[in-house]
């Protein structure tokens, strides 16, 4: 049924003001959830708060400080592969990474569930996008530390499953959330972004998979 269906089922069963989502290839350091909950209590406009995800093999290296969405139509983890020391300050961001993030239950009732059409990948960017449209914001909390192995479920950094769904969901994300005028104005950059990604995955041996996902 996919990541989104499982997450939605858990959220519906929850009876707390906040819900904490966590990947199955992580370890949570002490104080993580309490730090995120305190931030949500202080800043009532927050839809979500993303943890400081660091590499499980080398915690001095970042795995991600939430998600950024660029004009090229690319969504990616902020700070991935960079020194964790550079990401010690709280900040606002485009969306939280659902691999380790806390969400406001009352706001989820307004945005709706995680979109199960995604199945996997970019569902966190999609729901963060929807929350921003409704006037909420998303944040990064550096004192909430989570160690992340990375791609433990899908098997590797790049594989057919991940490349296909990432490409498909990238197009769906734009179609679903961007107004037609914004799509028109951003079209040159979006097309350039897709062209660069196609070339990148051709070199990785997944060009056909990426194009298939893009056209799905």
Language-model features: where?
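Acidic metal-phosphate-binding loop of nucleotide-sugar-dependent transferases
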Residues: 1, 25-27, 118
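Glycine-rich, basic loop-to-helix element that forms the pyrophosphate-binding segment
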Residues: 1-14, 35
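Conserved donor sugar-nucleotide recognition element shared by glycan-biosynthetic enzymes
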Residues: 3, 7, 32, 99-100, ...
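Short aromatic/hydrophobic "clamp" motif used to bind/position activated sugar donors
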Residues: 19
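Conserved donor NDP-sugar-binding/catalytic core segment of glycosyltransferases
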Residues: 26-70, 74
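Short, flexible, basic/aromatic active-site loop/helix in glycosyltransferases
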Residues: 70-93
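A short, conserved alpha-helix in the catalytic core of glycosyltransferases
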Residues: 94-147
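Active-site-adjacent helix/loop segment of glycosyltransferases
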Residues: 134-216
């Amino acid at each position: 049924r996919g990541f989104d269906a499982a997450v939605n089922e858990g959220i519906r069963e929850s009876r707390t003001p906040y819900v904490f989502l966590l990947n199955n290839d992580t370890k949570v350091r002490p104080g993580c959830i309490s730090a995120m909950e305190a931030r949500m209590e202080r800043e009532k406009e927050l839809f979500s708060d993303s943890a400081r995800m660091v590499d499980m093999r080398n915690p001095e290296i970042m795995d991600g400080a939430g998600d950024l969405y660029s004009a090229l139509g690319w969504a990616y983890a902020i700070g991935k592969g960079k020194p964790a020391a550079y990401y010690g300050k709280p900040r606002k961001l485009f969306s939280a990474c659902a691999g380790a993030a806390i969400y406001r239950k009352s706001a989820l009732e307004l945005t709706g569930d995680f979109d199960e059409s995604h199945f996997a990948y970019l569902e966190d960017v999609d729901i963060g996008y929807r929350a921003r449209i409704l006037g909420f914001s998303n944040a990064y909390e550096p004192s909430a530390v989570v160690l992340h192995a990375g791609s433990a479920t899908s098997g590797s950094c790049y594989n057919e499953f991940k490349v296909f769904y990432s490409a498909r969901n990238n197009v769906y994300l734009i179609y679903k959330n961007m107004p037609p005028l914004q799509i028109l104005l951003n079209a040159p950059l979006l097309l350039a972004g897709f062209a660069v990604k196609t070339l990148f995955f051709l070199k990785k041996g997944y060009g056909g998979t990426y194009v298939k996902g893009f056209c799905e």
